[in-house]
């Protein structure tokens, strides 16, 4: 059974639901956490109290995606680790 016959045997509504789940999962696990990482990196020292509170809430909300990228991204403040 090839891929085209398998795809044609699945109803179109089911394929749309699978596509919607894939898009939402990609947003939740990949796109928003990466954007949040880079936002925090660029604004960390200039954030106000409310912005920091909102960022902490977003980190809590998107924690699974943040954990996916945490081992690969290292955003130390400049000057840290210099001897």
UniProtKB/Swiss-Prot annotation:
Q: Reaction catalysed by this chain?
A: a plastoquinone + NADH + (n+1) H(+)(in) = a plastoquinol + NAD(+) + n H(+)(out); a plastoquinone + NADPH + (n+1) H(+)(in) = a plastoquinol + NADP(+) + n H(+)(out)
As for what it does, the entry says: NDH-1 shuttles electrons from an unknown electron donor, via FMN and iron-sulfur (Fe-S) centers, to quinones in the respiratory and/or the photosynthetic chain. The immediate electron acceptor for the enzyme in this species is believed to be plastoquinone. Couples the redox reaction to proton translocation, and thus conserves the redox energy in a proton gradient. Cyanobacterial NDH-1 also plays a role in inorganic carbon-concentration.
The subcellular location is: Cellular thylakoid membrane
PANTHER family linked: NAD(P)H-QUINONE OXIDOREDUCTASE SUBUNIT L, CHLOROPLASTIC
- Could you say which protein family the record assigns here? Belongs to the complex I NdhL subunit family.
Pfam families xrefs: NdhL
- List the gene name: ndhL
Q: Name one GO cellular component term.
A: plasma membrane-derived thylakoid membrane
**InterPro entries reported in the protein's UniProt record:** NADH-quinone_OxRdatse_su_L
Q: Subunit arrangement?
A: NDH-1 can be composed of about 15 different subunits; different subcomplexes with different compositions have been identified which probably have different functions.
Classify the protein's membrane topology as the record does.
Answer: Multi-pass membrane protein
- Protein name, as recorded: NAD(P)H-quinone oxidoreductase subunit L
């Amino acid at each position: 059974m090839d891929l085209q016959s398998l795809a044609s045997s699945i109803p179109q509504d089911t394929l749309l639901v699978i596509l919607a789940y894939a898009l939402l999962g990609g947003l939740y696990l990949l796109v928003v956490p990466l954007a949040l990482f880079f936002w925090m990196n660029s604004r960390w020292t200039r954030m106000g109290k409310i912005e920091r509170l909102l960022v902490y809430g977003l980190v809590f909300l998107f924690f699974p995606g943040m954990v996916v990228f945490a081992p690969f991204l290292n955003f130390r403040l400049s000057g840290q680790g210099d001897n």
